[in-house]
Amino acid sequence: MIIIDRFEEGFAICEKDGMELIKISRDLLPETAKEGDVVVAFGDGYIIDSDATEKRRKTVEDKFFGLFN
């Protein structure tokens, strides 16, 4: 799984498989890509995996709100 962590100087700094950070050229990502999106390789670039992104956001949100219960 590749998750966009942040953008720096024309690159997306991404977490790959929870183990390492990789740099992906911003040109290879959809214009709508943002921090926290899960992306997968597709052709010569990457696409956003909307289902995985939403599932991940929900998990993070549940953990966050669980801290206050």
What name fits each language-model region?
Residues 10-13:
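Short aromatic-glycine-enriched beta-strand elements
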Residues 1-7:
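Structural detector for short beta-strands of small beta-barrel domains
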